[in-house]
Amino acid sequence: MNKFFEFNLNVELGEVFNECTAYQISIEYLNKALDISNNLPINKYRLVKAYELRGKSKMFLNDGQKKINGQDWDLYWKARKLNYWEAIYDFSKAIEIDPKDSFLYFWRGFAYESLEEYPNAVKDLKIAKDLDPSFTLTTSILDHIESKGF
């Protein structure tokens, strides 16, 4: 199969499974796409899309988990934190490629906020707001963080 076609197919499948909330499957397809991209001159916007989707999938991976008790709770939160740090890595890679995309800064700021890394969250969310002043959700999250004293 043509490697460009294979890259795009894996990104598309990753997006479909992300939208269906099948985040683990989405991550698997996006991992394949990003592995293929290492040796190809891929369109930067498609590459950004792959990193952004993988970051979102990692953030939401364990969101719907039920029946957490006792020791499982600690493991759950450790896994969640790791997912958020991995998502931050993906958003950072995407920002390196396209530093003018306000949504990438928003998602990375949102991940930092979830980890209570408020200075980093505020920094990214302010950049997102500067890039797109009409993105009101950014303002809402900034107000929420500032109400906590940051």
Regions inferred by a protein language model and the residue ranges of each:
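Alpha-helical tetratricopeptide repeat
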Residues: 1-150
